[in-house]
Amino acid sequence: MYKIGIILGTRPEIIKMSPVIRELTTKKFFLIHTNQHYSENMDKIFFEELNLKKPDYNLNIGSGSHGDQTGRMLMEIEKVLLKEKPDFVLVQGDTNTVLAGALAASKLGIKIGHIEAGLRSFDRKMPEETNRVLTDHISEFLFAPTKTAANNILKEGISDEKIHIVGNTIVDATIQNLKIAEKNEKVCKFISKITKNEKYFLLTLHRAENTDNFEILSKLVTSINNISKKYEKNIIFPIHPRTHKKLNEFGLINKLENNHLIKIIEPVGYLEFLGLEKNAELIITDSGGLQEEACILNVPCVTLRENTERPETLDVNSNILAGSDPENILNCVEKMLKSNRHWNNPFGDGNSGKIIVNIVFGEKKP
């Protein structure tokens, strides 16, 4: 029987791979978790929350420089693949786990399927862009979420025969996991307690290009304060550890903490966060995944970046690129709050997981 290996290492990958894992329950497959960001114990709860099969292999790689982390992953993944001998390996996204998994499989002559293939920011300074491009070029099956992504791959000289436009599994995941969240009493109580059932904006900030540069981070802090004062709305800010560290280092944290409208909270679980997204009036972020989820949930999004690998969100007007200039950010917030919230979702109908599994086992286009 055809045997599949799934390789993942971060929570966004677990989320986006969850529909595929659910579709594989009647098939022969195993799950490798590199633990790129979190410990085995922390992610154990995450798998349980989403009612997913626990990983067969936890590699406990942890953090490190890009070369160190990718190299250790490559060695450990290779050991598992030699033992399991899968016919096919699936990876999702653009992390070091994805590149290491694809390289390990490629060196062993194992077929690779890249889910979310073809995304391009066209910014080679981003480590994720390198991972995306390299993984696409060594994969046999490229599961592109949209026609735009497929065209990016074609322009790089990859054969049309390898490309399958399947939609984005984030649609499946958001629909499936939102149902779990809405039935979870603990999650519902948390949302009510944090929001006090009032309207609010949701903020996330974690990208190195924003957090590691004092000038840019200072502008963003000014912008956040300006937004809260202009609209007199609570801004709920689940703060990323690296962002918290940098705000402290640069002496900027007090500028946020002294504003009673900015609610800085610890990072929250995925189901809780999904609830916060769904009920927000506006999402302000530098996250790629949140641009997609906001679009799916019909919540306007302001992206604190100069570029995006999700141009489809710009095309349907669910998202706008604001950069880091305070005046421009304020203008973008105003524009999105006035926008029509009923756009067409460009990422598919929520059946991407099923389509991908059918292609893997039938090796045919949908």
From Swiss-Prot:
It catalyses: UDP-N-acetyl-alpha-D-glucosamine = UDP-N-acetyl-alpha-D-mannosamine. Its main location: cytoplasm. Pfam families: Epimerase_2. Signal peptide: none annotated. SUPFAM superfamilies: UDP-Glycosyltransferase/glycogen phosphorylase. CDD domains: GTB_UDP-GlcNAc_2-Epimerase (cd03786). This is UDP-N-acetylglucosamine 2-epimerase. It comes from Methanococcus maripaludis (strain DSM 14266 / JCM 13030 / NBRC 101832 / S2 / LL). The lineage of its organism: Archaea, Methanobacteriati, Methanobacteriota, Methanomada group, Methanococci.
